[in-house]
Regions:
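Active-site and adjacent substrate-binding regions of carbohydrate-active enzymes
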Residues: 2-581
Length: 581
């Protein structure tokens, strides 16, 4: 595949690319300290090149106190020592480019660490030169300060938080600072204070650090929660839902009043005049389809594609850890809506997994020994045949599964621990709460990459920061590479199909059998070629409806996951791609 884009709407390079996300802490450890590092990634690049991916997305490797595993950054222009040095990074970047791949950095600029020099200076007092780089507000004296709504992180605070917003990580979104007797805003952890993008000095500082990395040779950015950077300056109270302690502030910070202005400014100040090889991806929780069209319209100069979360919230009940069964019709409605909605303008990221999601084969498939391989490859086929740029999260190509967490002491993730503490304090059954964490907790994605059957899965010679899944004895890269029928080789075939079949990249999307609760079916049509994708989302054989079966019975099979076929009946978890020319 050619590396240089040509800029035409249907010919930009990233539309036919496949991205592989690396979570450095858990990918490969070169020095035996139990934590993955840059040298470990460099040593495994041939594996990724053989897989066929085009872009590596590197989760944060900047210096960080690691309160949120690197998404709390204390220095944007260096490398976290446990991952290596800038020299190690430069070697990794050169080795990636030598293999014809690109490297995209994770950019986290909605917030910094509270240990970043910017925030330390801001915290010095109301007269600090950087006070307005963050969202500081005085306490409210006219609100009841008893109970959790006053801010559980600061029970001795003299007044209530400036508004009632809740944090994504449980509790209040405000932290009291005793030194100035004011509160600062943190939509995530108290150690992740939100930057004030209303201040042009903040924006200029962000532009400068982005240019610094691009000048170093990186190929773009995945922008973390980038649609949260614009807040309503009035910071109004959010609506309370049910008996909730905290208000929903999202209408005042999700896709806020100046977010398009800020992204267009980044495009002008950072990317203008640079080669078209660069990629910008915006992670956007809560983004609507209509908003995504604006963000990804090439004529507006904002981002190339978005990460949206609609389809990975379909098995949520009252909240993320209240797990309910997936209804296939809901999944089809969601993915189909985004396919048709971005058909004329815009572009989408295709993903099942990332560092925040549980393993897809455990979530929407069957991770038991009988059906794990077939359900993992079925899910991969469905995703990769949609229109958009596919993302593979490390280990997904092996069919890695959720991990067995026996007790709350086995859980490391700050989000899960915060939810557990709040839920148990509110009187919920601890065992039931833990069941929700087992199903949807972020630690499921963060167990070490399973390289081989040796101790600690070949990830480290030391003690891993998070234990390897015990099933690495059978589910690992060495075994998968050696087995032509493995999940790994199915991913290789899917990637090769995207690189060689224009209908996969550019074809129109048409959903079929929208109300069928067992079969997922759609076509991709480009010029004289039509592809039919059929997938069985159950553990039982399912016949293709007669009309569709008759129309496609003689169409050649392009790709499948269940061996030879002789009839239009899909075996458990089977997927097929047929071609009409």
């Amino acid at each position: 595949m050619a590396l240089d884009g040509v800029g035409a709407a249907d010919d930009v390079w990233w539309k036919s690319a496949v991205v592989y996300q690396i979570y450095p802490r858990s990918f490969a450890d070169s020095d035996g300290d139990g934590i993955g590092d840059l040298a470990g990634i460099t040593a495994r690049l041939d594996y990724l090149a053989d897989l066929g991916v085009d872009v590596l997305w590197l989760s944060p490797v900047y210096p960080s106190p690691q309160d949120d595993n690197g998404y709390d950054i204390s220095d944007y222009r260096d490398i976290e020592p446990m991952f290596g040095t800038l020299a190690d990074f430069d070697r990794l970047l050169a080795a990636v480019h030598e293999r014809g791949m690109r490297l995209v950095m994770d950019l986290v600029v909605n917030h910094t660490s509270d240990e970043h020099p910017w925030f330390r200076e801001s915290r010095e007092g109301p007269n600090s030169a950087k006070r307005n780089w963050y969202w500081w507000r005085p306490a409210r004296k006219d609100v009841d300060t008893t109970g959790d709504r006053a801010g559980e992180e600061s029970p001795d605070a003299p007044g209530a938080p400036p508004n009632n917003w809740g944090s994504f990580f449980s509790g209040s979104a405000w932290q009291h600072d005793a030194g100035s007797d004011e509160y600062y805003l943190h939509l995530f952890s108290p150690k992740q204070p939100d930057l004030n993008w209303e201040n042009p000095e903040v924006r200029q500082a962000v532009h400068a650090l982005m240019r610094w990395w691009l000048d170093r040779g990186v190929d773009g950015f995945r922008m973390d929660v980038i649609n949260l950077i614009s807040k309503d300056p009035e910071l109004p109270d959010g609506r309370l839902h049910g008996d909730g302690l905290y208000g929903d502030g999202s209408p005042y910070y999700i896709c806020g009043p100046r977010v398009h202005e800020y992204l267009q400014e980044i495009h002008r100040e950072v990317f203008a005049g640079r080669p078209e090889r660069l990629l910008t991806v915006g992670e956007m929780p809560g983004v609507t389809l209509e908003q995504a069209r604006l963000f990804t319209d090439p004529g507006r100069g904002e981002v190339d594609m978005v990460f949206q979360f609609e389809h990975v919230g379909l098995d949520f009940g009252r909240h993320k850890f209240d797990v309910r069964p997936l209804r296939l019709t809901d999944l089809k409605a969601s993915l189909g809506r985004w396919q048709t909605g971005l058909a004329e303008v815009g572009w989408n990221s295709l993903y099942w997994n990332n560092h925040d999601q549980p393993r897809i084969v455990s979530r929407f498939g069957d991770d038991g020994p009988e059906h794990r391989v077939r359900s993992a490859t079925m899910l991969a086929t469905v995703l990769h045949l949609h229109r958009g740029t596919p993302y593979i999260y490390q280990g997904e190509e092996l069919g890695m599964t959720n991990a067995p967490f026996a007790t709350i002491e086995d859980v490391h993730d700050i989000e899960a621990l915060g939810h557990y503490a709040q839920a148990v304090r509110a009187g919920e059954d601890p065992d039931r709460v833990l069941d929700g964490l087992r199903a949807h907790g972020r630690d499921n994605a963060r167990t070490p990459m399973q390289w081989d059957a040796s101790e600690h899965a070949g990830f480290t010679t030391g003690t891993p920061w998070l234990p390897a899944n015990p099933n690495h004895i059978t589910i690992n890269a060495a075994a998968a590479v050696a087995d032509p029928n493995s999940v790994y080789h199915h991913y290789r075939r899917l990637i090769a199909l995207r690189h060689t079949e224009p209908a996969v990249v550019h074809g129109d999307f048409t959903m079929l059998l929208a109300e069928d609760e067992r079969l997922y079916a759609f076509t991709r049509r480009h010029r004289d070629t039509t592809l039919l994708v059929l997938a069985n989302f159950t553990g039982e054989a399912v016949a293709v409806p007669a009309g569709l079966a008759a129309e496609w019975a003689r169409a050649p099979l392009v790709l499948g996951n269940a061996g030879p076929i002789d009839e239009m009946v899909l075996r458990p978890w089977e997927a097929r791609v047929h071609r009409h020319v």
